[in-house]
Curated annotation (Swiss-Prot):
PROSITE patterns: PA2_ASP, PA2_HIS. SUPFAM superfamilies: Phospholipase A2, PLA2 (SSF48619). This is Basic phospholipase A2 notechis 11'2. The lineage of its organism: Eukaryota, Metazoa, Chordata, Craniata, Vertebrata. Ca(2+) binds at Y55, G57, G59, D76. Expressed by the venom gland. GO terms for biological process: arachidonate secretion; lipid catabolic process; phospholipid metabolic process. It is found in: Secreted.
């Protein structure tokens, strides 16, 4: 399939999604995942962070279980602050580069910059924090009160 055809198909799909009652999927998760891979040099799959501790993944409550979980809570809080400014963090696309294994935001202003900064800071934090396998897929009802 030609790139132009893919662009048209993507445009139609996004238009249909916006017109439907189906809630939109987070569009920037792909970018955030790539930032994580940039920062951790591909040492750990992005999905390893999707269900970690009390804050990595959807939602979050209680006390973070470790340093990595604190990174996720800080990321959630950063998205919350961006939301207070009228941004939609999970839907905001931004410009960034991986420079010497460091996520670097190119977006200069507004929601794009705010959300990019949230994601870049979290990706760098993830790369520095130890990953404890026993905190993956924990029972959040018991451990995150």
């Amino acid at each position: 399939m030609y790139p132009a055809h893919l662009l048209v198909l993507l445009t139609v799909c996004v238009s249909l999604l916006e017109a439907s009652s189906i809630p939109a999927r987070p569009l920037n998760l792909y970018q955030f995942g790539n930032m994580i891979q940039c920062a951790n040099h591909g040492r750990r799959p992005t999905l390893a962070y999707a269900d970690y501790g009390c804050y990595c993944g959807a939602g979050g409550s209680g006390t973070p279980v470790d340093e990595l979980d604190r990174c996720c809570k800080a990321h959630d809080d950063c998205y919350g602050e961006a939301g207070k400014k009228g941004c939609y963090p999970t839907l905001t696309l931004y410009s960034w580069q991986c420079i010497e294994k460091t996520p670097t935001c190119n977006s200069k202003t507004g929601c794009e910059r705010s959300v990019c900064d949230c994601d870049a800071t979290a990706a760098k934090c993830f790369a520095k924090a130890p990953y404890n396998k026993k905190n993956y897929n924990i029972d959040t009802e018991k451990r995150c009160q």
